[in-house]
Structures are given as C-alpha cells and as structure tokens.
Amino acid sequence: MDILKAEIARKRKLIEEKELIDDSKKYFKRAELARKEEEDYYRRCGYKMDKPEEEAPQSTSANPVLELELTEEKLPMTLSRQEVIRRLRERGEPIRLFGESDYDAFQRLRKIEILAPEVNKGLRNDLKAAMDKIDQQYLNEIVGGAEGAELDTQHDLKVHEENTTIEELEALGASLGNGNDVRDMDIINKVLRFLLGVWAKDLNSREDHIKRSVQGKLASATQKQTESYLEPLFRKLRKKNLPADIKESITDIIKFMLEREYVKANDAYLQMAIGNAPWPIGVTMVGIHARTGREKIFSKHVAHVLNDETQRKYIQGLKRLMTICQKHFPTDPSKCVEYNAL
C-alpha cells in the first residue's frame, strides 16, 4: 500500500513540475503531457525547439485568390495561351498582370479555378440572353424617354451597311473557288454581312406593335443571336486564317447561294456539318497498322459540327442566313429547300 501511495505522489509531483495542473485547474489532457515529455526529450538531446508560429493576420484584400502562394512544385503548362485568355476573360480577370509571363498567368488561372469556382456558369440559353438584351433595350429607351421620330426606330436592329447589291455579289461569285483564298474570304465576308443587313432591314420594316409582340421579339433575338454566332467566323475571315477544309465548304455554299441553287447549297452545308466519313467524329486509327479504308477519311469529310461549340454556332448561323437568302432572293421551287422555314 505504501508503494502505491509513493507512486501516486511521484506522479503528482511530476505533473506539478510540468505545470499541467494548478489550484484553478484540477485536470489535464494526455496530449498536453505527451507534448511536455516530447519537449523535455528534445531539450535533453540538445535540439532547439521552434517557437509556435503566431497566427497569420487576416487578409484585408478584396481578392484573396491573388494573395495565395502555391507551395507545391511547379506543374507543366497544360493549356494554350489562347485558352488561358478565354477562361480569364470569362471570369472577368485581366489576361496579363504587369511583369507576368504566360506561365504565371496560367498559374493564376489555376488558383482562381481552384479557390473561386464559377457560380454563374452553366447551361446558357443564348436565345433567352438575346431576348433579355432586347427587353433591356426597350426598358432603357422607355426610361430615357424617346420622343418624336425616335419612337418609330427605338425597336430597330443595328444594320451593317455594305454598300453593295445582290447583283454585284452575284458577279463576284463567279470568281469563287478559283484558287485565290484571300479573295474568296473577302467575298464570303461581304455576302454574309450583306445577308445580315438584309435580315435586319426586313425586321426593322415591321410595324411597331409587331416588334413589341412575343413573336417579334423572338425574331429580333434570333437575328442578334445569329450575328453573335457568326462573329468568330468574321474574325477568321478578316485575319485570313480560316481552316482550309472549312473555307472550301463555305466557298461552295456561298457560290451555290449566289447562283440560287439552294438545294445544292444545302447539300454542301450537310456535307460540311455532318460529313460522310466512316467515323465522322475523327477516329482515324484504332491500331498501329493502317486500315484499307483509312485513306478515305480526310478532314474534309469529318463532321465539323462535332469539333467544338464555337464552330457549331457559326455553322448554325450560316444555315439561318441560307434560309434568309432563299426567302429574299427566291428561285424555282424545285431549287428551294424548306421555303417557309424562317
């Protein structure tokens, strides 16, 4: 019994020496005892104990993402510069900070995507966005108080004047597909912008009560949506960097449209959009050896509508302009396709 009392007294004295309990504290945690014993062990062995780090002050910056310091080793740049720019612009971030390299911008995008996930991104309805934009324009004009002659044009669409006629374009169309790619792209650009202008003028000529109706707003929104869909195509045409296979197909479509051969133009459109390759998505090799039918799979025959979303949109916009061209510049019914589609 004396041995047990002596052991209890020794343990109590040890705990008091380690300052684990006092008059105000009658108990302690085993983790505290283990930490004290560990400190004593390191002290006996001659190791210097690091002082506990002070709590870091809270950041007062409005953007805590930019203050984050990556401690892990650098990862390879897995995105192209164009893709990095596109994603940064979608999030409203600057595409390059002062003194920032392409890799630094990629790392900044990576931090933003990790710590600030997109909250307003999802399945976007482009047509609804265009209609909302038109409604907002109506509200702005009402609040601004348009008077007089402005009331007749307050619901009009923007018209891009090309200062050309369909007869001039038909004359230019005779030289399409003769090997001059720069000239072909200029003609394609003129024709598409001319058709957008014809469409906008037709919508602007409607009565005001028709423009205000649901169907009228839908037609205006469709025109605005088509114009936004075609903007990437116009950009490629201006910079003369349209891919050769897409350029060849669009050249055939425009040529047939100017000749008012709308059935042939529709066939060329389907050839470009859907294609007729054995594997239309672009699977050209399933093993290490070439197959007998592989030489039939060219980029021209691949379904471009499956490549990416941007390409799908301007291909869809091109189809709408084909319908507008057929509606405003008719020909024999045997050469028309879905005459009353739009």
Swiss-Prot record:
Lineage, uppermost ranks: Eukaryota, Metazoa, Chordata, Craniata, Vertebrata
Keyword set, alphabetical order: mRNA processing, mRNA splicing, Nucleus, Spliceosome
SUPFAM superfamilies: Functional domain of the splicing factor Prp18, PRP4-like
Organism: Danio rerio
One GO term (biological process): generation of catalytic spliceosome for second transesterification step
A Pfam family it matches: PRP4
Protein name listed in UniProt: Pre-mRNA-splicing factor 18
Described purpose of this protein according to its UniProt entry: Participates in the second step of pre-mRNA splicing.
InterPro entries cross-referenced by the UniProt entry: Prp18 (IPR004098), PRP4-like (IPR014906), PRP4-like_sf (IPR036285), PRPF18 (IPR039979)
Gene field: prpf18
